[in-house]
């Protein structure tokens, strides 16, 4: 019996999972690692610690599954996207910490490039908004702030990679320096139409071509693990960024299919097929995966604060002891009692992109209780996801959503999922396996080696846990949305004219 090992390198922890042919989890391990905050709005990770934690959980997951390395058919890698590492080609030693996707230190670089009108070129070629979220300006910052780095980069002495590339390089012990199209599409350096690193983009961001990894499909054999690591040479056969792997793991393989991941934030992706659609409504167009000589594109919208609003009620206001208690408290009242909660703790993401918005709880009366506020907080997650899907309808011609597939921690909340179905007026479907990110990477690897035969087989493995059908009267829904939009209006631009944030 053979298995697939999935490496899931996330923002706060490194995980590994072993799957069998029926997509059942046979072994699992997870290890958290250090978050480094050198100054406000800066976020870093130690790449060596990431690799060490990842190596540890791979061995642990195999032990938990009671299998030997030679029983692994292939390895798939999925990762936190955009996070940037630069290391020495000869020694494999990082020249600086990894700069994490959440890091805002390059915001001023982005502002300057916008003043020069570069954001329009970047949007047309990459499908991305010009923002410090993506890798391009992070690379620029490291090369300009680490002594001698730019010269060494131009001499071909350094390697750049997103986290997938860093893990691959270490698994193969310096033999493979490559990335997949999905991760590359989040760097600001890949032309998503030609599928090549783009000279004009490299020139705008002042990034030397010599440091870039080779571009490959997401489902192909990248190389093998070095025998010294596990005592076996295991093919590494699948790579995709986390939200793209989750889209694949949800079997959203046809154009028009959509998934939403309800984690700390929410990430909503819609498969838009084989042709990119560039959104002028501040949604992101990316490559979800490349396989069989073609790529699939997605449109993505992200909500900064999703499940994190419930953590805040738990830790900041001490409304309940466990996040899972939120559902019972919110269900103890029949509606939000006129209370609306806009959780713009760090501004608003898509489709507003307002970094000056701040959190707002509005409509409170003497009769409001913590149950109403908790219900309003849960509803805010669904309202924000509704706003993204509504914007997607404007960007995608003839787009009518049939069902929304859901995963992530907060997808276990039945009240929230029912409210989401009511707002969207479509089915919300939760699968049996909600570890869709790791599963997607496993599928991509297994398809490359023939462990799974076809996309149809992947679709057949996807199983429903629960379907939520819309049941709210239209006039009630419209009233809720009208009030939500009023509340968002109050939260927007809150600190625009003040000096504090």
Curated annotation (Swiss-Prot):
Q: What InterPro entries does UniProt report for this protein, alphabetically?
A: ATPase_NBD (IPR043129), Carb_kinase_FGGY (IPR000577), Carb_kinase_FGGY_CS (IPR018483), FGGY_C (IPR018485), FGGY_N (IPR018484), Glycerol_kin (IPR005999)
Which reaction(s) are listed as its catalytic activity?
glycerol + ATP = sn-glycerol 3-phosphate + ADP + H(+)
**First and last residue of the signal peptide:** none
Name the source's superkingdom: Bacteria
Provide the binding site for ADP.
11, 15, 264, 307, 409, 413
Q: Name one GO molecular function term.
A: ATP binding
* Amino acids binding sn-glycerol 3-phosphate: 11, 81-82, 133, 242
Q: What is its EC number?
A: 2.7.1.30
Binding residue positions for glycerol? 81-82, 133, 242-243
Q: Which GO terms describe its cellular component?
A: cytosol
Activity regulation remarks: Inhibited by fructose 1,6-bisphosphate (FBP).
Pathway(s): Polyol metabolism; glycerol degradation via glycerol kinase pathway; sn-glycerol 3-phosphate from glycerol: step 1/1
* Swiss-Prot/TrEMBL keywords: ATP-binding, Glycerol metabolism, Kinase, Nucleotide-binding, Transferase
Query: Which EC class heads this enzyme's classification?
Result: transferase
* Matches recorded under CDD domains: FGGY_EcGK_like
Q: Name one GO biological process term.
A: glycerol-3-phosphate metabolic process
Q: Which family does it belong to?
A: Belongs to the FGGY kinase family.
State the function annotated in the UniProt record.
Key enzyme in the regulation of glycerol uptake and metabolism. Catalyzes the phosphorylation of glycerol to yield sn-glycerol 3-phosphate.
Q: State the name under which the record lists this protein.
A: Glycerol kinase
Q: Which organism is it from?
A: Borreliella burgdorferi (strain ATCC 35210 / DSM 4680 / CIP 102532 / B31) (Borrelia burgdorferi)
- State the organism's lineage: Bacteria, Pseudomonadati, Spirochaetota, Spirochaetia, Spirochaetales
């Amino acid at each position: 019996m053979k298995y697939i090992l999935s490496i899931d390198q996330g923002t706060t922890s490194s995980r590994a999972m072993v799957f069998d042919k029926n997509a059942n989890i046979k072994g699992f391990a997870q290890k958290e690692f250090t978050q480094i905050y050198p100054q406000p709005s800066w976020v870093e990770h130690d790449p060596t610690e990431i690799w060490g934690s990842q190596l540890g959980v791979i061995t642990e997951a195999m032990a938990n599954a009671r299998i030997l390395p030679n029983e692994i058919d292939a390895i798939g890698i999925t990762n936190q996207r955009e996070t940037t590492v630069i290391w020495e080609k000869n020694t494999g030693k990082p020249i600086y910490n990894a700069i994490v996707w959440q890091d805002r230190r390059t915001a001023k670089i982005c502002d300057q490039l916008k003043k020069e009108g570069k954001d329009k070129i970047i949007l047309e070629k990459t499908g991305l908004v010009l923002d410090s979220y993506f890798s391009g300006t992070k690379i620029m910052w490291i090369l300009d702030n680490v002594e001698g780095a730019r010269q060494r980069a131009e001499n071909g002495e350094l390697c750049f990679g997103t986290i997938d590339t860093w893990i691959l390089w270490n698994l193969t012990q310096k033999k493979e320096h490559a990335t997949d199209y999905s991760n590359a599409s989040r760097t600001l350096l890949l032309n998503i139409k030609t599928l090549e690193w783009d000279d004009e983009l490299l020139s705008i961001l002042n990034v030397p071509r010599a440091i870039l990894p080779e571009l490959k499909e997401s489902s192909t054999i990248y190389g093998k693990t070095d025998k010294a690591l596990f005592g076996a040479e295991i093919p590494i056969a699948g790579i995709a960024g986390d939200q793209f792997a989750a889209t694949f793991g949800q079997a959203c393989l046809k154009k028009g299919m959509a998934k939403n991941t309800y984690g700390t934030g929410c990430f909503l992706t819609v498969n838009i097929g084989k042709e990119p659609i560039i959104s002028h409504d501040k949604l992101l167009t990316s490559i979800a995966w490349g396989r069989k000589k073609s790529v699939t594109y997605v449109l993505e919208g992200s909500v900064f604060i999703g499940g994190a609003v419930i953590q805040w009620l738990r830790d900041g206001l001490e409304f309940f002891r466990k996040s899972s208690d939120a559902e019972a408290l919110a269900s103890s009242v029949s509606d939000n009692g006129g209370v609306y909660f806009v959780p713009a703790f760090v501004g608003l993401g898509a489709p507003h992109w307002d970094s000056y918005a701040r959190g707002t709880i509005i409509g409170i009366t003497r009769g409001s209780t913590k149950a109403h506020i908790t219900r309003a907080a849960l509803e805010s997650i669904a309202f924000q996801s509704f706003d993204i899907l509504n914007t997607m309808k404007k960007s995608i011609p003839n787009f009518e959503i049939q069902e929304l597939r859901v995963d992530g921690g907060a997808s276990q909340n039945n009240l929230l999922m029912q409210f989401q179905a009511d707002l969207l007026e479509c089915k919300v479907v939760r699968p049996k396996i909600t570890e869709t990110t790791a599963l997607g990477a496993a599928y991509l690897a297994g398809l490359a080696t023939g462990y799974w035969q076809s996309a149809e087989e992947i679709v057949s493995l996807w199983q429903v846990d629960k379907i939520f059908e819309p049941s709210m009267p239209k006039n009630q829904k419209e009233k809720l949305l009208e009030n939500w939009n009023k509340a968002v209006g109050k939260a927007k631009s809150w600190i625009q004219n003040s000096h504090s944030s």
